[in-house]
Amino acid sequence: MQTVTLHNGVEMPTVGFGVFQIPDPENCQQVVEEAIRTGYRLIDTAQAYGNEEAVGQAIRNAGVPREELFITTKLWISDMNYQGAKEAFATSMEKLGLDYLDLYLLHQPVGDTFGAWRALEELYHEGKIRAIGVSNFKPDQIA
């Protein structure tokens, strides 16, 4: 599987399986399990998708060692501030049933992105997240 090396040295698969618009838990779990069985190693979910629990169950059921998977989720705008990001991360981790996250993204450039980013940096430095980033931001919103 092809990977790209992020600035911090983390290897990320270049192809992933996203679960946007799969709200039914049983369906989501089934398709994620099948995606992992067919070779996908990057699974992309988000707090806003409402399916982190199903993704977590699929990860546990798939029979692939956790360290071979790359799991991404995203912070939604309703929690886009320092404290909200910390609490939402803890909730996502509980729903996913993971000890660490490979990539945590700010989902949209709305709200207190600076405060949320500070929280992500702290979680990264605590070893709870391997990499952090942004999603749906334009270049001038990150410069």
Label every model-predicted segment.
Residues 1-69:
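N-terminal binding-site loop/beta-alpha segment at the start of enzyme catalytic domains
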Residues 2-7, 14, 72, 88, ...:
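Short, functionally important structural connectors and interaction interfaces within domains
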Residues 13-18, 43, 69-73, 101-106, ...:
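Hydrophobic faces of well-ordered beta-strands that scaffold small-molecule active sites
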Residues 23, 80-143:
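Glycine/proline-rich, positively charged
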Residues 33, 53-57, 73, 87-90, ...:
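N-terminal, well-ordered alpha-helical segments
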Residues 41, 66, 74, 95, ...:
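Basic side chains
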